[in-house]
């Protein structure tokens, strides 16, 4: 009978790698699982993921792209689904009004001394009211205004003021007694808040001779 540790033809060879070989299947499975987990983690960063609708984030090459559903608001701004307000380039405001006749001022004009107009040439946005001859700002911004008020067959000096919310901002005068037609003209840039009002007021003199061809114009230069 062979002695312990010896084979029939010699000593048994020790196999130090045998136990390692027995563990090899378990080590291979652990490595494969870790590789699969890493692949799953890296998959969204290298492959596009299709969104279910237009407002969900889209992951592409490790960056998050947001598609916003935007719509214009009442004041001309565009508000996205994230609440970001962007001014719309298509929001324009402009008006120009004129006198087409020499009719005498109405009772309303005599009381308030508002210089009113009877014909609108341009009214983009409809923010100039012809009946009251008052312009109402639709939004905060820088506005340009100009006026040209003609007095006819009147030897009195007239003073015309552009009024913002009831207060005079600029004035113009016409008082040459040697001409039958003369105009008081001026222009200005104004910072206006939303709902601010602008109109023309006759501060001095009268327009009893008529004021045909007088004009009042304004437009939004840019919003703020």
Curated annotation (Swiss-Prot):
A GO-annotated cellular component: glutamatergic synapse
Subunit structure, interactors included: Homohexamer; disulfide-linked homotrimers. The trimers are assembled via the globular C1q domains. The trimers associate via N-terminal cysteine residues to form disulfide-linked hexamers. May form homooligomers or heterooligomers with CBLN1 and CBLN3 prior to secretion. Once secreted, does not interact with other CBLN family members. Interacts with GRID2, and more weakly with GRID1. Interacts with NRXN1 and NRXN2 long and short isoforms produced by alternative promoter usage. Weakly interacts with NRXN3 short isoform and not at all with NRXN3 long isoform.
Gene Ontology BP annotations: maintenance of synapse structure; positive regulation of synapse assembly; spontaneous synaptic transmission; synapse assembly; synapse organization; trans-synaptic signaling, modulating synaptic transmission
Positions of the C1q domain: 88-224
Subcellular location: Secreted
Role according to the record: Acts as a synaptic organizer in specific subsets of neurons in the brain. Essential for long-term maintenance but not establishment of excitatory synapses. Functions as part of a trans-synaptic complex by binding to postsynaptic GRID1 and presynaptic neurexins. This interaction helps regulate the activity of NMDA and AMPA receptors at hippocampal synapses without affecting synapse formation. NRXN1B-CBLN2-GRID1 complex transduce presynaptic signals into postsynaptic NMDAR response. NRXN3B-CBLN2-GRID1 complex transduce presynaptic signals into postsynaptic AMPAR response.
Sugar-bearing residue positions: 53, 110
Entry-linked Gene3D superfamilies: 2.60.120.40
Entry annotated with the keyword Ribosomal protein: no
Tissue: Brain (cerebellum), adrenal gland and spleen. In the adrenal gland, expressed at high levels in the zona glomerulosa and at low levels in the zona fasciculata-reticularis.
Pfam families: C1q
Signal peptide: 1-51
Gene for this chain: Cbln2
Name of the protein this chain belongs to: Cerebellin-2
Keywords: Disulfide bond, Glycoprotein, Secreted, Signal
PANTHER family, per database record: CEREBELLIN-2, CEREBELLIN-RELATED
